[in-house]
Amino acid sequence: MGFTAQQEALVGSSYETFKKNLPTNSVLFYTVILEIAPTAKDMFSFLKESGPKHSPQLQAHAEKVFALTRDAATQLVAKGEVTLADASLGAVHVQKAVTDPHFVVVKEALLQTVKEAVGADEWSDDLSTAWEGAYDGLATAIKKAMG
């Protein structure tokens, strides 16, 4: 079964909820990444000098990751696959020596952040599955661009 319009709607609405508290949710996202994989700190220029804290770079990067995942949901419904609009994403991930386990860490952090952003009453298996599917589509496209 492919990605559904209902899953796209779930990702879209929860993305809007995530954005309502972007500063806090961005810090949470990177805090979870570093809790799972402390060595990932050196992969992000805005984390090298300190841990996650409110900063324009941190917020911009978190918003980009979540927006790309939301866009992946839209593409999966429309055409069944994700095509990167930014061709440099593959090269950047190669330069940072990103490997499969890093994608797993980011997915876990993304899911924990969405869960926190929407709250326990809105979080569901369907919402988790929708975000997982969208992120997996994005990760597949990035890995393909990495060569």
UniProtKB/Swiss-Prot annotation:
UniProt note: phenotype after gene disruption: Normal growth and flowering under non-restrictive nutrient conditions, but classic symptoms of extreme nitrogen limitation under restrictive nutrient conditions, including severely stunted growth, increased root/shoot ratio and delayed flowering. Following inoculation with symbiotic rhizobia, accumulation of free oxygen at the expense of reactive oxygen species (ROS, e.g.
Subcellular location: Cytoplasm, Cytosol; Nucleus
Binding site for heme b: S45, K64, H93, K96
The keyword Metal-binding appears for this protein: yes
Tissue specificity field: Specifically and strongly expressed in root nodules and at low levels in seedlings.
GO molecular function annotation: heme binding; metal ion binding; oxygen binding; oxygen carrier activity
Modifications made to the protein after synthesis: Nitrated in effective nodules and particularly in hypoxic conditions; this mechanism may play a protective role in the symbiosis by buffering toxic peroxynitrite NO(2)(-). Nitration level decrease during nodule senescence. Phosphorylation at Ser-45 disrupts the molecular environment of its porphyrin ring oxygen binding pocket, thus leading to a reduced oxygen consumption and to the delivery of oxygen O(2) to symbiosomes.
GO BP terms, alphabetized: intracellular oxygen homeostasis; nodulation; response to symbiotic bacterium
Residue ranges occupied by any Globin domain in the UniProt entry: 2-147
Induction trigger: Accumulates in developing root nodules upon inoculation with the symbiotic M.loti strain MAFF303099.
SUPFAM superfamilies (alphabetical): Globin-like (SSF46458)
Positions bearing Phosphoserine: S45
Positions bound to O2: H61
PROSITE patterns: GLOBIN, PLANT_GLOBIN
Highest taxon of the lineage: Eukaryota
Family the UniProt entry places it in: Belongs to the plant globin family.
Subunit structure: Monomer.
Listed name of the protein: Leghemoglobin 3
